[in-house]
Each structure stands twice: as C-alpha cells, then as structure tokens.
Amino acid sequence: MEKFQGYLEFDGARQQSFLYPLFFREYIYVLAYDHGLNRLNRNRSIFLENTDYDKKYSSLIVKRLILRMYEQNRLIIPTKDLNQNSFLGHTSLFYYQMISVLFAVIVEIPFSLRLGSSFQGKQLKKSYNLQSIHSIFPFLEDKLAHFNYVLDVLIPYPIHLEILVQILRYWVKDASSLHFFRFCLYEYCNCKNFYIKKKSILNPRFFLFLYNSHVCEYESIFFFLRKRSSHLRSPSYEVLFERIFFYGKIQHFFKVFINNFPAILGLLKDPFIHYVRYHGRCILATKDTPLLMNKWKYFFVNLWQCYFSVWFQSQKVNINQLSKDNLEFLGYLSSLRLNPLVVRSQMLENSFLIDNVRIKLDSKIPISSIIGSLAKDKFCNVLGHPISKATWTDSSDSDILNRFVRICRNISHYYSGSSKKKNLYRIKYILRLCCVKTLARKHKSTVRAFLKRLGSGLLEEFLTGEDQVLSLIFPRSYYASKRLYRVRIWYLDILYLNDLVNNE
C-alpha cells in the first residue's frame, strides 16, 4: 500500500479524490499484477489465472487496452458478436476482467487510506491465533452461557447491480469512475451470461470487494441504530438516514419508518448484545424476551426492504432458544447444556445438599450434513455405508493412502472441539473402510482377503498423524491415549477450509 500512496501523491489524485485517471496509468496495472502475485493461490491475479495469457505479464496488452479505453465505443460489443470479436487474440470478457481487477485495487486505496488514518496513534494487537476460524469458539463459550436467544440472519445479496453502484457512490466521490464502473459491470455480466456454459475465470477480489462494501453499508446503519437506540424516541428521524443516494425512496421509507419503527426502537435498548458475522450470515445473541427478538427480526426485514430495496423474507431470520434449539455455526451444531451438580456442605453437626446448575456450550458434529457431503463425493452412499472410490484406483497405493489419511486428519483436526466424539468415530470409520475398499478394488480382491494379506498395519496410518499433533498438547504420552477423544481441543491454526477431496 505504500507503493500506491507514493504514486497517488505524485499524481495528485489523492488530494482531489480522482480515481478515473488511474485507469490510464500503466504502472497501476503493474502494481495490480505484483499485488496479485503476493496473494494466496486461491486469490491469484487474473493475469496468472488466464490460460490464454501464457502466465506472463504483457505491457503490449495493457497499452492496447488503454488505447481502447480512450474510445469507449470499441468496448461495447453486442452479445451475439462476442465469439467473433477478439482483441489481440483475447475475447472481450478477458479485458473486462482485467478492468475489474484494476478497479478492485484502485477503489481499495481510499478505503485503506481511511482505515489507516483511523488507527493512527493506536497500538493494534497482532496475533496469529486471531485469524483462526476456531478463535471465536472460546469467546462463545464464555459469552453464550449468559444469553437466552440467538437471532440467526441470512444476509441477502442485492439482486440488481445498480444497488452496488449506489452504495459505492457514498464512498467514491469521483463521478467518472462510477460511470465507468457501472458500464464495465454491466458489460462484464453480459459477457459472463454469454460464457455461462464455459469455464469462466473468477475474480474473487473484485466481487469480494463489492460484497464487503454492501455489508459495510448495512452494518454501519445497524451499529449506528444500536448505539443510538436510547435516543431514538423523538418523532423526527430524518437526520439519521440522510444519504446522498436516497432521493427517490425517502418519502416511502419515512412513512414506513415512522409508522412501525418508533415502537420497535423504543425496545431495542440492550447493553448486553453481541453481533457475529460469518459466511454470509450473522447472529445476534442477547439475554432478552421473545418479544424483543421479534422486534429485532422485523427491524432487519424493514431495513433490507426499505433501505436496500431487497426483498427479504422473514423466514430467513430464525430465532433460536439456546437451551432447546441448535445453532449452526462454522460447521458445528451449538447449544447450551445444563449440567446439574450436587455439592454437600457440612457445618458442625449439620450437613446440607446444594444443587447447582452449570451452563456449558455443547458443540456437536452435524453428522447428516457431513455424510451428505461424503456421499456427494462418492465416499459412501446416502445412508453412510462406505463404498470404494473408483476414480482413485488409477493412482498408486501410497498416493491413495496419503489422500485418505490427509482427509481424515483434516476432519479430525477441525472437529476435535466437539463435545461428543461418537459422530467423529463414524466419519473416520467411513473413510478407513472406503480406503480399504478402494485398495481392494484396485488389486481386484475382497476386503477380507486384502486386510488378511497386509495385516492391521495399514489402518495405523490413520492414527500416527493425530498422535504427533496431540503429543504437543499432552507431553505425557500415556495420558494422550486415554484423553484422546474426551478432551475438547480448539486448534487455532485453521485459517480456511480446503476442499477435502482435491486437497493435495
């Protein structure tokens, strides 16, 4: 980002908030290309993912593209002519993808500068474990035990592209960039619809930025109302929702807002509320009554429908009572479990029995969904009975065994924090027997004859990896075997989930 700031200060674009001239600078394409090289493999730059590009950066393509952008009529190609029209050996879809990569990098600059200025003079705690998927579970174990209800909300996607453009209007003040972005976004989607049957090149950085800007606008309104809920009992609310792109819908929204929201906002005051967003969903945990949770539910529905023009059904907001219902969270089924404890106390000649109840977060493995995923990838049938993996029989024995061991180790690694390990045993059994059936099918033998010939040493490969990991946690090895499946272990080095089948 320091490189970007240096170039922006040189061009004077930062002071004037003009981003459009950067689309015609060759060094921005170079920086976007270099920035893509430093990303993870799953978010590589479009310059590397395009097979026609020969995995090399070409300044000639960039120069021709810039010349073509000066004549915008040459960028507009009818959908029926997309196959015939190519530019320097590439279709127009490739160039719209190049522009989308560049736009994502350029528009991130004001966001990064604003974020950096907000943290100036503050010391941020840097911890590798905070990036882990499992880092949230210790927080939930401490907080959810004091809550009664959880609101599970599915964040809707905007169905119209103009909504995304309007959201960016609040952040990007350059009208030329917004017009150019609108034009390229519509043309890019038209090209994508034309190539829908072909394997198109994904640009996760661009669409991730659009989604984050959409969610950022929603959360800014939600957090503002959450903090100011105690001051929203006055009859005038116009100042609270003043936005630069809100002209056409302002009267209709205030009519709905004034009629419905005063009674809602009057009951939204709750200092003990927690908000968590993950995988396109968000949960709202609080210690309140069902009436207040219903108020929050219809608040979300009205917010999405009236402010973002997104049809949002109330069925997408679920109210879960933690003591009775299970909450799907990061691949676990979480609920609160009551553990009764009886304590005997004796004072002089009198003894007392004190009944205590301890609330504990119970995280279970969703066995039905995991078996469904394994059945989809042909590890078992829909009933959970292991079958042979026919597509892997062409590989060597060591390769087949290593694949199954890796998958089993990843599942064990991720679901080791479950409170009950019975379902984990079943998943491991499916994978082990599937591995044996695959090897037996390759050697054209039965499972019984294959195991009799190789012995039990074949299945020991599934246990060695776990013993090596757990030895770091339990220094005394004789305790590791006894507490292997009775202790909940949250591994804080899981940053993202790989595809279990294609994980190499």
From Swiss-Prot:
The chain's coiled-coil residues are none
The processes (GO biological process) annotated in the record are:
mRNA processing; RNA splicing; tRNA processing
State the UniProt keywords alphabetically: Chloroplast, mRNA processing, Plastid, RNA-binding, tRNA processing
Matching InterPro entries, A to Z?
A: Domain_X (IPR024937), Maturase_MatK (IPR002866), Maturase_MatK_N (IPR024942)
List the Pfam families: Intron_maturas2, MatK_N
Assign the protein's first listed, main location to one coarse class.
plastid
General function of this protein: Usually encoded in the trnK tRNA gene intron. Probably assists in splicing its own and other chloroplast group II introns.
Name listed for the protein in its UniProt record:
Maturase K
Q: What is the lineage of its organism?
A: Eukaryota, Viridiplantae, Streptophyta, Embryophyta, Tracheophyta
Gene field: matK
